[in-house]
Each structure stands twice: as structure tokens, then as C-alpha cells.
Amino acid sequence: MNDILKEIAKRRTFAIISHPDAGKTTITEKMLLFGNAIKTAGTVKAKKSGVHATSDWMEMEKERGISITTSVMQFPYNGKVVNLLDTPGHEDFSEDTYRTLTAVDSALMVVDAVKGVEDRTIKLMNVCRLRDTPIVTFMNKFDRDTRDPLELLDEVEDIMKIKCAPMNWPIGMGKFFKGVYDLYNDEVTLFEGGHGHEIHPYKKIKGLANAKDQIGADLFDDLEMEIDLVRGASHEFDQEAFLKGELTPVYFGTALANFGVKEMMDGFTTYAPEPQPRETNERLVNTDENKLTGFVFKIQANMDDKHRDRIAFFRICSGKYEKGMKIYHERTGKMMQVSKALTFMAGEREQVEEGYAGDIIGLHNHGSIQIGDSFTQGEKLKFKGIPNFAPEIFKRVKLNDPLKMKALQKGLVQLSEEGATQVFKPMISNDLVLGAVGVLQFDVVAQRLASEYNVKCSYEGVNVSLARWIFCDDEKKLNDFKKKYEVNLSYDGAGYLTYLAPTGVNLQLAQDKNPDIIFSATREH
């Protein structure tokens, strides 16, 4: 039991959230560099050179230079075991990202300091807010001409409704970026360009006054005034407020040049929480219980061309995973032997011998495991809070070869089980409607249907703009509703009744006329 406690105390499981192009994949690479997980960082933009970022591994990602599917990377840092869940930065893959945030204990928010807080980051922060997830912030790209740092803090506080506690402070920006000043240890770290691919021992000077010559007189005078202002106007770091999700420690730097990342990582591994207890429908599960429990938050098909398999990403919530153990599948009521669970390094797979609360392991899945499934060592527990989000874009699927209808249905349902798209079968037609949160997912589905299921399809427009899941406790009212609105009703891939609305006005009218019917934008898996 002591071993379990020791291992849990080491774990830090988190995701990175940001707007596309804020530098998330770059910062991921630098963390792996510091954790000795990779030897040199591949720069993300240089896709054509064959140096692909480690965490972008699906063919389409390599072609387009974006992270589509969530990768999981485990590496050691400062005596801790870091589980980093890399989430898609591209806005088309937000559903996958939202769900990943249910499997972490904290998050790192990367802000492009040139642009400030952007739309996508706001959406992701709102998901973090649902669970009061502790957030660490990294203001990136200070080797470029950025917004004023005080203005950036104000913007985060104003839009994200979270207090900011700057841990260090940038000295200049762009061509005049000289480094950062540690507000708590009175230490200056001086910036030099050109060390993005390696770990470089940047020069440190104890005491702000001792760095005046290196900073330059004019910039130094401005800096002193700015620091006085920051100390007076900003919040001090408070561990309790941070753990409640009320305050975020803020670090400044430039991930591309590998500057400021180490300081942020040191702070993160010090302050971020170890794995936390989790709610189930039956009771609270504590991490130090000796029986294994956990849930599946993602399914990824064909992670490896050689294996043609599907992997369920399983977050351990308590106990210890040991190779070859039998676990109980709560939804099916069956026992299942796990002999070859995997640990990940972005597409590089290794068999895992053991795992503890906070770890993410991969279970081989031949179609029996779904997103949201819970596993235990026998107790009937169902973990809460793994959401399905209503899609925002819809298309009708057109099959090029009508004889392949069965293969198309199978492919669409299997791909929808991964959670990036959803399939709807209207009550009164044989159409298949595909829904997604972003346009790019339709390309991904067409490409994967062709390569994995040998089915060619195309899309056409469909008169649907919103989807809402329908719930009602009164069976008679629900049946009346079904008869009256059958033209708008479909069943999703999991068999849930869904209202597909052509317009927002149509949806509002249906809601107004049916106060006893719940129209929900999310449903639990």
C-alpha cells in the first residue's frame, strides 16, 4: 500500500490547452526534451523536411502540420512522473479535446502573447471551469513583438474570470527581449537566441540590481517601475486558490527558443496536484484504494499500420494495474483479461508492466469498449462526467457504390465511437447524417473510410444546423412528441433520440412548445 501512495504522489497528469498556432506542440516538444524523452526537438513548421513533431503522428497531421488526435506521453521530470495529454490545437477537433480534459488533474494554458486570449482557449477554459481544474499559464513568443504583459494579465483575468499571479516577469520583448526576472527569488535569467533544439544553461544573475549592465540602463529603469507596479497590482501566488481553479500562476518566455519552459515545468511539477479522487454514480473513489478502477475517455483506431487495431485510452483512478490482471467491464458485466496494455510516446508503443492512479494506459479493443466505459476489479461503479457534445456542422453521406452500404454503416459507427464525429439515422428515411464540431473531421472520415474500410463516399448538404438530445421522464409525453416531430427526429450511433433542427428559431419554437421535454446540448457517455 505504501508503494501505491509513493507512486501516486509522483504523478502529474495534465493537458495543454491553447488556440491553434499558440505554440502548444512546440512547448510539448521542449518538455519532452527536458524530460530526456527525445534528444532534439523537431520544429513543427518544418513538416516537409521530414522532421515531424513527435506528438503529430497520423498521416493527415503530418501533411497539414496540425495535431488531430490526442497523444499521450509519459516522461520523468524532477523526480515526478509526468503524464502529458497533447490535445488537438486545430479548432476542428474540439470534441476530442473537451473529453481529454475529463482525464486530467490540471492543465497548462499556452497564450500567444502577440495575439492575447483567443476564442478557442476561452471555450477550453470553460470546460476546465466545469471541474474547477487548476490552470498554469505560459505566455509564449516573447522573442517577438508582443502585447503589453500587464494588458495580457488583465485580459486573462477579465475574459477567463481567473486571478493571475505572475511568477516571473519579461524583460523587454522582440529584438529587445533580454530575459525574465523571477519575482519570488529575485533572480534574472538572461536570454540568448539560437538554442531551440537543445537544453541550454542560460546565465542567471542573483539580484535585479546586479543585472543592470546586461539589461541596459533605459530598459532597466522601465523594468524597475514595471515590477513595482506588478508587485502592487497583481495577485500573489496562493496554492489553495490555485488548487480550487481560482488563480493561475503565470510564466513568460518563448517555447521556440526553449526559454522559460524549464522554469514553468519546475513550477508546474511543484504546485500541480497529484491524482485526485473521482466521482462515480455510486460513491467517491479515492486514489489510494488498493483495487484498480478507471474509465475510457478516448478510442483511437489503427494507431499502427502494422497492427490495424483500436486502442482504448484508459485513465487509472485508483489501485495498481499489473500485466495479465482481470478487470470487470461495468457496462457489459463481463470480466476481461488485460495482458498487453500499452504506454505511449506519441505513436511509439511499449507494453506496460504496471500503472498507478493518474497514468493513462492503452487497452486493445476489438469493438467491445466504448468511450465512457468504466472498469473495476469487480465492484459495479460508473464514473461520471465524460461528455458527448452536440455537433455543429452536418452533412448527408453519399455512397459511391450502393452495394457497400453495410461496410459504410459499420465504418461510420466505429469511427463515431472514437468520438470525433457522430452518426444520425433519421426516423423516417434511410439517410445517414454525419455531424461534427468542425469541417476537417469530414475529410478525416472520408479518408479513413477509403483506407480502412475500402468504402468511397462523398457528402452533400443537409438542412440541419443544430442537434439536441431529447430526454423526458413522462413516456406518454415523449411518445406524443415523437409523433408530432418525427420529421426532425433521429437516433444517434448509441441509440439516443436526437432532435435535428434546421434553424435556431425552429429549435427555440420546439422548446417553447414542449416545456416538459429536455433538449440537451451534451449527454454523458
Swiss-Prot record:
Job description of the protein: Increases the formation of ribosomal termination complexes and stimulates activities of RF-1 and RF-2. It binds guanine nucleotides and has strong preference for UGA stop codons. It may interact directly with the ribosome. The stimulation of RF-1 and RF-2 is significantly reduced by GTP and GDP, but not by GMP.
Native source organism of the sequence: Francisella philomiragia subsp. philomiragia (strain ATCC 25017 / CCUG 19701 / FSC 153 / O#319-036)
One of the record's GO molecular function terms: translation release factor activity, codon specific
Family indicated by similarity: Belongs to the TRAFAC class translation factor GTPase superfamily. Classic translation factor GTPase family. PrfC subfamily.
GO term, biological process aspect, one: regulation of translational termination
Keywords assigned by UniProt, alphabetized: Cytoplasm, GTP-binding, Nucleotide-binding, Protein biosynthesis
Domain tr-type G: residue ranges: 9-276
Subcellular location: Cytoplasm
NCBIfam families: prfC, PRK00741.1, small_GTP
GO cellular component, as recorded: cytosol
Binding site for GTP: 18-25, 86-90, 140-143
Superkingdom to which the source organism belongs: Bacteria
The protein's name in its UniProt record: Peptide chain release factor 3
Pfam families in the record: EF-G_D2, GTP_EFTU, RF3_C
Keyword Thylakoid included in the entry's annotation: no
